[in-house]
């Protein structure tokens, strides 16, 4: 409903979805019939943008463009930031539903701070 109203009234709203691959303790791929949640924005005539949520600069650029659209009176934007949930769903979550070694490898390989330090701003 909020996206529908924002689109109909061309509100300066930026919707951000932190796509972390999990719905509580269930992998996203088993609970949704679309690969990219941002595809759903098109149903409301809202531009959907997919960005690497681990890349600080990519997120900044997507947000900058969405802010420019909003300020120009062009209505809302939906940003899907693809990332990975490193911690459990709640404090004390034993995380029995996923492979801890795989999670640590993903974090090690895609740590946003390491990527930020390795890539100078353009």
Predicted regions and their residues:
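Glycine-rich ThDP/TPP pyrophosphate-binding loop and its adjacent helix/strand module
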Residues: 1-122
């Amino acid at each position: 409903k909020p996206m529908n109203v924002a689109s109909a009234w061309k509100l300066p709203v930026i919707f951000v979805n932190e796509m972390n691959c999990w719905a509580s303790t269930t992998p996203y791929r088993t609970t949704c019939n679309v690969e990219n949640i941002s595809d759903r924005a098109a149903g409301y005539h809202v531009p959907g943008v997919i960005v690497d949520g681990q890349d600080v600069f990519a997120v900044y650029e997507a947000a900058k463009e969405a802010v420019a659209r909003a300020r120009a009176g062009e209505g809302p934007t939906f940003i899907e930031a693809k990332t990975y949930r490193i911690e459990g769903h709640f404090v004390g979550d034993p995380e029995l539903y996923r492979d801890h070694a795989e999670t640590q490898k993903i974090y090690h390989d895609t740590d946003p701070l390491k990527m930020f330090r390795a890539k100078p701003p353009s």
